[in-house]
Amino acid sequence: MPYLVTEAVGVELPHPHRYRWTDPPQSLAQQAVYHAQVHDIAQSDPRYAGLLAWAGFDYASPMGTPGQHVKWAGVADGFRVAKPGAAIYLSQIDPRVRPVVVPVFFWELGTADAPRGPGPNALLASNCEQLRVFIGDAPAAGQPVLDSELYGHLEYPPTLLDLTVSRDDHPDLRIEGYVDGKQVAVVRMSSDPAGDQLAMTVDDPVIYDDGSDATRVVFRAVDAYGNQRRFGTGEVRLHITGPADLIGDNPFALGEYGGLGAVWLRSRPGRTGRVTVVAEHPTLGQARVQLSVRAAGRQRIV
C-alpha cells in the first residue's frame, strides 16, 4: 500500500534549531539540510506515495516560543518571505525553464557566528550542471561538489563547498552557474558592510479602491548587490502619501526580526491615485516604492 508521509521536519521546543532570522546562520542552513534529506528519502522508494513537509510559513501557536507564541517551522516567515530552508524547493525545476543558484548561507566574515566565513560545509541549492565559485578574483580553493551520497535521489541535489576564508579584507563572492556549457546565472555577494543599504519592494503595482484590496511592502537590510543581510539594528520609519492605509508596525524594529520586515497597504473606498512609501533608517538610508490605486469597476477574474 502506498505510504504518504506528512509533517516531516517541523520544529519542537526546546530545540537547538528554531529557524528564526535572528538565529545563527548554521541553524537557518540546517533547515534546508533537513528538508533535502527527507525528500531524498521519500524519493528513494516507490512505495512512498509522497511527502508533505512542515511547514510553509511560521505561525502563531500557544505551544510556540515562550513570550512570542510563534512556531518557527516555516520555510518562509510570517511575512511570507522565503528563508534559506526554501532554497531546496526553489531549485527543483528544469534549468531551461528557470536557472537557479541560491546560497544557503550569508556571506559575512569576521562576525561572532562566522569568524572565517560560512565554513567547510557551505550549502548551495542549484539546478545548474556546473558551478564555479570565486572569492575576489581568484577561484575558491574548494570548488562545488554535488553531494550525491546524501541527496542522490533528488533531481537537482544541493552542492557542498568549502568557504573557509583566512584573509583579512572584505572580498566579494561570485557564483556562476552553467548549463550546456553556457553561463546562465551569476550571484554576487559582498562581505563589506560599508556598502549595506535599505531595500524595499511592493508586490503589486496596482490595487483597487474597494477598501479591502491590499498589497505587501517588504523592506530589508541588503548588501551592495541586493542580498539580504542577516543582521540589522534600529528602526525603520515609514512615510505614506496617497489614498492607502498602512497595516502593520510603524516604526518597525528591524533588529528584533533579523534585518527585514513587512507591512501591508490597503486601499480606501472610492479613493484613487498614486501612493508613495518612503522608508528611512538611521544608517541604511532611504528606500522608496510607488503604486497606483485604480477604480475597481468590473474586474475580470482570471
Regions found by a protein language model. Name each.
Residues 1-182:
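Extended substrate-binding grooves/exosites of carbohydrate-active enzymes
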Residues 189-212, 295-302:
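Low-complexity, Pro/Ser/Thr- and charge-rich linker/hinge segments at domain boundaries
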Residues 156-168, 252, 256-270:
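Short, hydrophobic beta-strand segments
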Residues 168-172, 212-214, 270-274:
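Extracellular Ig-like/FN3 beta-sandwich strand-entry sites
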Residues 109-117, 206-215:
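Short, solvent-exposed loop/linker segments at the N-terminal edge
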Residues 120-126, 212-230, 275-279:
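Beta-strand-rich structural segments
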Residues 147-154, 242-258:
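Low-complexity "stalk/linker" and mucin-like segments enriched in Ser/Thr/Pro/Ala/Gly
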Residues 181-193, 285-295:
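Edge beta-strands of extracellular beta-sandwich domains
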